[in-house]
């Protein structure tokens, strides 16, 4: 049975289309076949080409026109089946159309475009996961973990002057956030959320999701807009997740932990055919940037999305009272595992009126007009077998629990974090000895995602069970563990330079998505390079060449008849190619890759924006670092301490000698009109998005700040500016409108 636009992959037929159609096709001796039976009613064709009426046909001599007509019919069939639940052609007719389309594209390759129906499940399309900016930022949502917190959110609305607003309630899908960009009705890009500003391009893989249309279909009430960003969640239904894991286990591969992880993994496959086999679905829950369409209400936008052929939920409700919201939350929670065929972890409540949404605005991370109610995490009892520890890339030693396999929140869990030694002592969880049972513990999936142990079930504790004794030495190198600072809850291995465990983790991290993003340098490769002594540490990574990789068996293949000795494998060559590409990443990624404590993507960007080069960062004092927007004293101290170690400095020097970019390029043709100035932009501008305004400030030498203070030089005020404009007036900071902002950008303060 279809629910919410999703049809299980084991429905009738190859595409799930029942054979009850009246459409037909008749082969023609003199020309091509055009399908004009049921299911072709929405195809626009010239009268001389197609005879109107069920079960008829006509000959089209122009292959481009024939291709266009058949492609539209296939898209129509998918739309009717997956979205309207009203199929009009059967399996055989669908297959004949697809085969004819494939034959046309074989004969005329120029017809094989990325949005052709044959590319949905056909040959692999190149997917390199390049990054692109969202046209409008994808915000997060503030969470509420109790009805009282929802009531507090509602009270804030009323304090802001919003009286008795209509409230839209919808299920919170536990999936992967996605942003679809349609231009003139055509799907041109699909991006993951990423950091909210920039996402990964997964267009080729999203096009294999059968419920996602490649072209939008307009109606009289909802014409197709010139441009629209469609936000939603990609998910893997629970049944499909279980089938996938069964197949992985049968193939001797590791299963996915939960449906969300499997959805994310499926969407990031390099081969779209693998993604196509995973039965992914999507639910749309909003729009971002748009041109040619402006909804009056969130529910109005959802009506438009459905009319355009996009998958929406049938569980959306608009209520007029807070009591109605609480009833929706209670009702959905009682049917949490049956209400839809995919996992949910809460309810999202939104002010329905779009004008009110604009008026309420957003905080730095989330809209004030929406709240996500999270259901209480599921808790189960599990048998604790032992407590193990591992060492991370910064030397932090983390204990984790090993349990009997336990089902919780739809996943089978065997390991759960215990955070640090202090938490083990505080919770007093006790493992057993060899052959002896340990504590029965309360296992919870915090946020329905991360498994954690709340504590022991004391009534079930075996008599005489002793407390866990934490190790005093590193599990990898045997070095005595230390506190970084007095009172630190973490224990760390101070042997940062030589500890094998830290080395492996750091080399692996260098290649991670938030650092250099080097495909082919995973954990197995990091271990292989270190074990073969091809590299001594992460500083040697960019010095790798073919001769070096030949010393690591993982990157070699057996010689052919005319070859002597082991040869570099294709994976080895790809790694070298990817290493070469990675040398040109932005400075913030290089900073993150150094594994400096507290320096993640946010701090890395802040440092790169402020100083522009590695040399400038190394030359800066702790006070100068701390004064940078988004840095502060803790990060500044960590950076200074890191560069005091000669072997750390040598890593940077090695990378620089190998050609890694150590400074961000700045367009010298752009006048530095804002050098030394701090500018805050608040509210909506006509000609600037939030990100483009920030970039305009940074490129002219200014600092784009997020809050108003006495150090702020100018505040740019757009529509629905909010409290920042008020604070600027209180502090006497000059306030500019958009026209004044443009003048400031062009000529600096002197031009005002």
Swiss-Prot record:
Show the taxonomic lineage: Bacteria, Bacillati, Actinomycetota, Actinomycetes, Propionibacteriales
Per UniProt, NAD(+) binds at 91-95, 140-141, 170, 193, 233, 350, 374
Q: Which residues bind Zn(2+)?
A: 474, 477, 493, 499
EC number(s) per entry: 6.5.1.2
- The gene designation is ligA
Q: What does this protein do?
A: DNA ligase that catalyzes the formation of phosphodiester linkages between 5'-phosphoryl and 3'-hydroxyl groups in double-stranded DNA using NAD as a coenzyme and as the energy source for the reaction. It is essential for DNA replication and repair of damaged DNA.
What chemistry does it catalyse, as a reaction equation? NAD(+) + (deoxyribonucleotide)n-3'-hydroxyl + 5'-phospho-(deoxyribonucleotide)m = (deoxyribonucleotide)n+m + AMP + beta-nicotinamide D-nucleotide
Renumbered to this chain, the signal peptide range is none
Q: Which one GO biological process term can you cite for this protein?
A: DNA repair
Cofactor(s) recorded in Swiss-Prot or TrEMBL: Mg(2+); Mn(2+)
PROSITE patterns registered for this protein in UniProt:
BRCT, DNA_LIGASE_N1
Region named Disordered = 1-25
Pfam families given in the database record: BRCT, DNA_ligase_aden, DNA_ligase_OB, DNA_ligase_ZBD, HHH_2
What InterPro entries does the annotation carry?
Answer: BRCT_dom, BRCT_dom_sf, DisA/LigA_HHH, DNA_ligase, DNA_ligase_AS, DNAligase_adenylation, DNAligase_N, NA-bd_OB-fold
Write down what this protein is called.
DNA ligase
Q: GO molecular function terms here? A: DNA ligase (NAD+) activity; metal ion binding
Top enzyme category: ligase
Q: Which residues form the BRCT domain?
A: 669-752
- Alphabetic keyword roster: DNA damage, DNA repair, DNA replication, Ligase, Magnesium, Manganese, Metal-binding, NAD, Zinc
